């Protein structure tokens, strides 16, 4: 049985899934900046594990009011500041199926080897290709936090001369040596349970990680942007508690009833 991740968001462009995201507040979603393409019409779907809900009795469809890109975002060629805030047209109501994930404090630090989870609608495979198809049901993969220097060395072998830094301080790596999420899940959450709370450690940034199964996932490190995120929100405060481990367990038990 698949767990239920109540903060998971499908970011839609003209009603087509383009990226994942994480709900952090009734009115706000965090995703990757590189997911955003100009002034297209965006919306989000949440409260369901299905990519194409048959009805919206529990699933929510919400138009997007505004999207705020981080000013340091450089673009796909050399990704820095790969984080964006999605402001929803109307606040969502929390339920068993819709809950926010906690933002980490700026000084929060995850130890190497910490167990975390990544989620999204791409195929979980040992071998990836650019033609990987989206799956109708939300997928999950267990991953472990990886040392940034080791992660950087891994990618330098494949892409750049050794003197060029790739994995920067605003990034965080996680791996499970072959099982990872791939195309279609940029912006999706790297979620870690710490002392009974679920923390948004990162959002998926590098799709080049899909090229080889052994490549670690590279995520935008949310601690580097917590202050910026809170500043963009109207009062910097959250309207409800973020998801606890106890609540997630309850959601997991209720998951078979979702069906929408």
UniProtKB/Swiss-Prot annotation:
Its EC number is 3.4.21.-. It comes from the Eukaryota. GO terms for molecular function: serine-type endopeptidase activity. Disulfide bonds join 19-35, 116-192, 151-173, 182-210. Glycans are attached at residue 55. GO terms for cellular component: extracellular space. InterPro entries: Peptidase_S1_PA, Peptidase_S1_PA_chymotrypsin, Peptidase_S1A, Ser/Thr_Proteases_Immune/Dev, Trypsin_dom, TRYPSIN_HIS. The active site is at 34 (charge relay system), 82 (charge relay system), 186 (charge relay system). Keywords: Disulfide bond, Glycoprotein, Hydrolase, Protease, Serine protease. One of its GO terms (biological process) is proteolysis. Residues 1-234 form the Peptidase S1 domain. The keyword Kinase does not apply. Belongs to the peptidase S1 family. This is Putative serine protease 45. The gene is PRSS45P.
């Amino acid at each position: 049985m698949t767990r239920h991740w109540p903060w998971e968001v499908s970011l839609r462009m003209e009603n087509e899934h383009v990226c994942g995201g994480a709900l952090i507040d009734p009115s706000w979603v965090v995703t990757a900046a590189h997911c955003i393409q100009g002034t297209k019409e965006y919306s989000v779907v949440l409260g369901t594990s299905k990519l194409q809900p048959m009805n919206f009795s529990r699933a929510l469809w919400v138009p997007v009011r505004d999207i705020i890109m981080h000013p340091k975002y450089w673009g796909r060629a050399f990704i820095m500041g790969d984080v964006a805030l999605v402001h929803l047209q109307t606040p969502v109501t929390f339920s068993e199926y819709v809950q926010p994930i906690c933002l980490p404090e700026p000084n929060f630090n995850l130890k190497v080897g910490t167990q975390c989870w990544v989620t999204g609608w791409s195929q979980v495979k040992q071998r990836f290709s650019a033609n990987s198809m989206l799956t109708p049901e939300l997928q999950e993969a267990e991953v472990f936090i990886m040392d940034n220097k080791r992660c950087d060395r891994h990618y330098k072998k494949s892409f750049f001369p050794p003197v060029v830094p790739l994995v920067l301080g605003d990034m965080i790596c996680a791996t499970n040596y072959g099982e990872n999420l791939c195309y279609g899940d940029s912006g999706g959450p790297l979620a870690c349970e710490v002392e009974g709370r679920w923390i948004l450690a990162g959002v998926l940034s590098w799709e080049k990680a899909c090229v080889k199964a052994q490549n670690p996932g590279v995520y935008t490190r949310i601690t580097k942007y917590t202050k910026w995120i809170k500043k963009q929100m109207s009062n910097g405060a959250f309207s409800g508690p973020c998801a606890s481990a106890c609540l997630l367990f309850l959601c997991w038990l209720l998951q078979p009833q979702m069906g929408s």
